[in-house]
Structure formats: structure tokens, C-alpha cells
From Swiss-Prot:
NCBIfam families: PRK11195.1 (NF008397). Catalyzes the facilitated diffusion of 2-acyl-glycero-3-phosphoethanolamine (2-acyl-GPE) into the cell. Gene3D superfamilies: MFS general substrate transporter like domains. It is found in: Cell inner membrane. One of its GO terms (molecular function) is lysophospholipid:sodium symporter activity. Belongs to the major facilitator superfamily. LplT (TC 2.A.1.42) family. The keyword Membrane applies. Residues 39-52, 112-144, 188-226, 278-280, 326-343, 388-397 are cytoplasmic. This is Lysophospholipid transporter LplT. The keyword Cell membrane applies.
Length: 397
């Protein structure tokens, strides 16, 4: 690993390429592992309402470690933090392969993901700056969504063939991410020498939360991204139950193909946002956020595969255009106030709290027997109303 502490701010520097490759492999493993583990739950006859619980234990790790992972990212070279985090993911995936309870193994992957996220986004502001930061976020999101696209499909297709093969492929992807992390230049720690007293760390994290919440721009970004990712992860589980009801298809692969359409759309939307939206014109993304909810509502009423594909791709386009500028806004403003690692850790707390809440409501709705189509209609309508309210609030403040 290079010991240089100087950044080549080119969008295609060696360090940036290594970050993007590592992110692709890590996100590929995350998404393949989700669908492979869901297939394992089906094979072992777990109840349907337990499926979102799997994701809830994952995001629970994010919430539990939120006060600490931002400081970890800012106290060490971020490339090494990413390597350690991917090592934890590798251990979690391997444990599921060897028959350990899937919820426990997936929790360990969640711990790795919690440590990984502040470092992967925080390092962007160290490898590039200014106007290139939005473009770097576009590359990161495009890499992530390409991994979602391929990882989701690979997880479902391989699981239809053999669940153990799918799980092993996830472990290999995490191993590749660890190797890619080695090639990220060792940059100076952003905030070395901080106290590791847990009480002080928690207090510092709460201060970072307060600081970001009091700033109108970062509060706007936090609420917007939290709503988006909470809705996004809920949609993934909605599709798993919606496909057999609306389309009459019962395999593991079809929900992954539909999720892939969302992923393709987000790549397109992220690219458009990088060209059309700057930090000064972030509000341009808000109509796209409202349209996400409207299109989800329309999608829930479909009974044919081709319209479902098209509508999910449109949801993805709107999603990419919506979330990329909000991420860039938080990184730029947060880096100057609380540090990039802490800013992303606070963002993770918001996003994963939203995921936990939405998944909990969704799991409860399934448990009490509400049909999946009405769940989808209500979900889309509420999301559109929430983004509309956020936009009105942002314009007033």
C-alpha cells in the first residue's frame, strides 16, 4: 500500500479506481448475499414475515455502531478501514456457508457494512474536491448500482441452482474487495488522536447529529436520503412477495431481475444528476423524488411482466437523480463542520433508522395479513406525500 499522503484529485486516479473496484465487489457481495440468504430461509421453511427481519438485523448493526464508526473512519487511513470492514463481511458470509444461523451471520455482515460506509464515502472528499465531488459520487453510485444489478441477479440465479454455491460466490466477492482495498493509497487520517472513551464518543456523535440537524442544508439532505433508502430497501422485500401474487411466478430469480431494473435506472439517473445538478441547484432533484412514490403506486397495480420492468426502471432513474445530489451536499457541508466520516455516520443512522421503521411496519402488515398490492399502493402514496412535504419545507427555509 502506498504511503503517500498526497491526493491526485483526478477523477480517474489510481486511488479512485481502487475505491470504485472495491465498492463494486463489496456491494456485489452485499446484494448477492441478501437474495442467497432469502433463498436459504425459503429452503429452511422460515415464515414470510421473517424475510424483512433479516434486513432489520443488518441495519440494526448500523444503528448500534453509528456513534463509533464515523470516528473510526476519521481516525485511521480510510482505505485500511475499508479493508478491515470487508474482512468482517467475508467472515459473516463464510459463517453462513458453514451452517451458522443465517441471522447471526448476516448481523456480522451488517457490522462490517456499518464500519465500511463512512470510510467509502468519506474517502471521496480526500481523493477529489470541488466540482468533481458530485461526479465522484456519481461514479460511486453507478458502481454500487451496477453491483446491485449483477449481485442481485447472481444471488437469485445461483440460489435457484444451489444455495451453497450462491453463498460461496458472496464470500469470494468480499475476498476480492479486501484485495482491491490494498491498492488504495494510504492517506493521512482526517482527525487523528481523538478520545476512544465510549461515553465521550457517544457524546461527540450526538454533537455531530445536533450540528448537522441545526444546519438547514444538511438537515434537508439527511431527511431526503433517509426517506429514499428506507423506501428502497422496503421495495426490495415488497417485490419478493408481490411477484408470485401479481405475476404468478414463484422462482428466486424473477424478483432479482425486477430489482435489476431499478439498478439500471439508478445508474442512468445518477449520470444525469452529475451533469445537470450542482451543489447550488440541489432542489432540482425534488420533483424526481415525488415521482418515485407516484410510479410505485402505479407499479403495484400491474399484472404483466413488461410494464413492471419499465416502471421499475423509471423508479430507478428518478431515484438516482434524487439521491446523488443530496449525498454530495451532505459530504461537502459535513466535511467542513463535523468531518466527512462523522457526517456519513450520522447519515447512516438516519437512513438505517428509516429502514428499520419502514421494514418493521411492512413486516407487521404482512404478519397481520394485509395483501401485498394494497401495501404497495399505500407505500407509494405515503412516499410521494413525504417528499412533497420535505420540498415545501425546504423552500420555506
Amino acid at each position: 500500500m502506498s504511503e503517500s499522503v498526497h491526493t491526485n484529485t483526478s477523477l480517474w486516479s489510481k486511488g479512485m479506481k481502487a475505491v470504485i473496484v472495491a465498492q463494486f465487489l463489496s456491494a456485489f457481495g452485499d446484494n448477492a448475499l441478501l437474495f442467497a440468504t432469502l433463498a436459504l430461509l425459503k429452503a429452511q421453511f422460515y415464515p414470510e414475515w421473517s424475510q424483512p427481519i433479516l434486513q432489520m438485523v443488518f441495519v440494526g448493526a448500523y444503528i448500534l455502531f453509528a456513534p463509533f464508526v464515523g470516528q473510526v473512519a476519521d481516525s485511521f487511513a480510510k482505505g485500511r478501514v475499508m479493508m478491515f470492514a470487508n474482512g468482517l463481511k467475508l467472515l459473516g458470509a463464510a459463517s453462513i456457508c458453514f451452517g451458522i444461523n443465517p441471522f447471526l451471520g448476516y448481523t456480522l455482515v451488517g457490522v462490517g457494512a456499518a464500519a465500511y460506509s463512512p470510510a467509502k464515502y468519506g474517502i471521496l472528499g480526500e481523493l477529489t474536491t470541488g466540482s468533481k465531488l458530485v461526479k465522484a459520487n456519481g461514479l460511486m453510485e453507478a458502481s454500487t448500482i451496477a453491483a446491485i444489478l449483477l449481485g442481485s441477479v447472481a444471488g437469485g440465479v445461483l440460489a435457484d441452482w444451489h444455495v451453497l454455491v450462491a453463498l460461496a460466490a458472496c464470500a469470494l466477492a468480499y475476498g476480492g474487495a479486501v484485495v482491491a482495498n490494498i491498492y488504495i493509497p494510504k492517506l493521512a487520517a482526517a482527525r487523528p488522536g481523538q478520545s476512544w472513551n465510549l461515553i465521550n464518543m457517544t457524546r461527540s456523535f450526538l454533537n455531530a447529529c445536533t450540528s448537522l440537524w441545526r444546519n438547514g442544508e444538511t438537515r434537508f439532505s439527511l431527511v431526503g436520503t433517509s426517506l429514499f433508502w428506507g423506501a428502497g430497501v422496503t421495495l426490495r422485500f415488497l417485490l419478493v412477495l408481490w411477484v408470485p401474487v401479481a405475476l404468478g411466478i414463484t422462482d428466486n430469480a424473477t424478483p432479482t431481475y425486477l430489482n435489476a431494473m431499478v439498478a439500471i435506472g439508478i445508474v442512468v439517473g445518477a449520470g444525469a444528476a452529475a451533469k445537470l445538478v450542482t451543489l447550488e441547484t440541489v432542489s432540482r432533484c425534488m420533483p424526481a423524488g415525488i415521482l418515485i412514490g407516484v410510479v410505485v403506486l402505479i407499479f403495484s397495480l400491474q399484472h404483466e411482466l413488461l410494464p413492471a420492468y419499465a416502471l421499475l426502471m423509471l423508479i430507478g432513474v428518478m431515484g438516482g437523480f434524487f439521491v446523488v445530489p443530496l449525498n454530495a451536499l451532505l459530504q461537502e457541508r459535513g466535511k467542513k463542520s463535523v468531518g466527512a466520516g462523522n457526517a456519513i455516520a450520522v447519515q447512516n443512522l438516519g437512513e438505517n433508522s428509516a429502514m428499520l421503521l419502514m421494514l418493521g411496519i411492512y413486516s407487521l402488515a404482512v404478519m397481520v395479513g394485509i395483501p401485498v398490492v394494497p401495501i404497495g399502493i399505500g407505500f407509494g402514496a405515503l412516499f410521494a406525500l413525504a417528499i412533497t412535504a420535505l420540498w415545501i419545507w425546504q423552500r420555506r427555509h
